[in-house]
Amino acid sequence: MTAANIFMNETEKTSKRKQCILRAVNEALAEVDYSKLSIEDIASRAGVGKSTIYRWWKHKSDLVFETFKENTASVFELEFDKSLQYNLSQQLLKLSMALNQQAGRALLVVMAENREAAGDFFKQYLLPRREQTRKLIQLSIERQEIRADYDFETMLDMLYAAVHYQIIFFNCVPDEAYVEKLVTVSLAPIMMNKAD
């Protein structure tokens, strides 16, 4: 066996172990909330030692963040051939569903309790997605679907904050009707009319 084959086998084993651990986090969160989540239980469910988990993640909050990222890896892709309104509606609906799942709810707890974790989530997860949304906004301006003279950063903050607000304070997942109305009202001041 060549060194390259050995390396590939080790890489594959590492990837499989990580997947088992992340699956174990999902399983555990289906039974207990974040405060009762333990590395011992996750290790037992995944069939690995605690040291294996700590080799890749320092804290259980890191595990929850990684699990959320894995669960939503392909969920938030934008469709650049479709309208800004369509894309924002789809993103907010998918975010609502993702945050209402066990890993999403645990992540909300982590962010409320840990400023550093919240900052990491913002930098590593939200900023790249926001950058994609900025590109879509620019494309929508170029297509003359929306006006350019608007504070889009604040608009995005308001849209996403409304979803978090519904989930955290009202313990409800915004439905399609709510999201459609939210996006329509938010975009109304900047939509280009055919007569413009």
Report the location of each language-model feature.
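Basic, helix-initiating cap at the start of DNA-binding domains
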Residues: M1-V32, K36-R45, D62
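Hydrophobic alpha-helical connector segments
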Residues: F76-Q102, M155
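Hydrophobic alpha-helical segments that form the core
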Residues: A148-I168, E180-S186
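Short hydrophobic/aromatic patch on the recognition helix
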Residues: G47-W57
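Short, basic, alpha-helical segments at the C-terminal edge of helix-turn-helix-like DNA-binding modules
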Residues: F68-V75
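Amphipathic alpha-helical packing segments from all-alpha helical-bundle domains
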Residues: M97, A118-R143, E153-T154
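C-terminal peripheral helix-coil segments that are non-catalytic and often amphipathic
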Residues: M1-M8, Y86, Q90, M97, ...
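Amphipathic alpha-helical segments used for helix-helix packing
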Residues: T67-F68, A98-D120
